[in-house]
């Protein structure tokens, strides 16, 4: 258990290191802490903090830097609640894919690190379907999902359907099957085609087949923006090995997906420092994440990935604000 003096010195050391990235010596720490302590006393406290695994001494310097364990104690017990001056533009309610992409870019821009957003799992349930004639025997099928996602597909037919036939087909599908998964609609249609004229039934079956493919097709599971920002972070630009590992992590995405998926089960902002998540075993990276919602239900997670030497208070606010913006934008796109 740390006494108050040790806590103040650890807090001052971490804040100083976050600010300039240089190992902190006893003289610098004496000035930064504001405590009237002799350099010898400060060195003794720093030795105790090192024994506890909260700070370490790089071999190239007599100063100290925080460990992941030190950052964790700092984040859990020492962060101030001062509101940072963060100017965030509104995310305009529009198609979910655009909201997600804009959110990743916003996170990256505000943090100057990497913004990541876990994409909601696409559903094959449809809310509305409509047909538009493009030319002879060529039609546009417009499929709207319950979350406002719009899929447009062009189909070619052997029959040149009239406007009344297109309306008949869309009305039947919307009145009988809206709210069902496309796979279920396809099965039900097989037993109900005799209720409709043959040509219209064929059109509906073609629309449902292409709709099933469109709404369950492979999609990007996670959107990542700002990877190149790490090139400007001294913690990475000076170590090509770490930089290469970080870019491999972003390219493969698997570990990021697992971490964001796990984070969606938590309420509020979560912070993973270094390798403590055991999902992204990277001692030099930290992840600040938060879930976002659609109509009050958690549908995904977003966050910032950057060096362990980050302004955690600012990152927490950026992630928290962005999760609220995304939730509002998605829920208002109804």
UniProtKB/Swiss-Prot annotation:
InterPro entries assigned: GAF-like_dom_sf, HrcA, HrcA_C, WH-like_DNA-bd_sf, WH_DNA-bd_sf, WHTH_HrcA_DNA-bd, WHTH_transcript_rep_HrcA_IDD
GO biological process, one term: negative regulation of DNA-templated transcription
Keywords, alphabetical: Repressor, Stress response, Transcription, Transcription regulation
Source organism superkingdom: Bacteria
GO molecular function: DNA binding
Keyword Transcription annotated: yes
Gene3D superfamilies the record matches: 3.30.450.40, Heat-inducible transcription repressor hrca homolog, domain 3, Winged helix-like DNA-binding domain superfamily/Winged helix DNA-binding domain
Family listed: Belongs to the HrcA family.
Function: Negative regulator of class I heat shock genes (grpE-dnaK-dnaJ and groELS operons). Prevents heat-shock induction of these operons.
Protein name per the record: Heat-inducible transcription repressor HrcA
Gene name per UniProt: hrcA
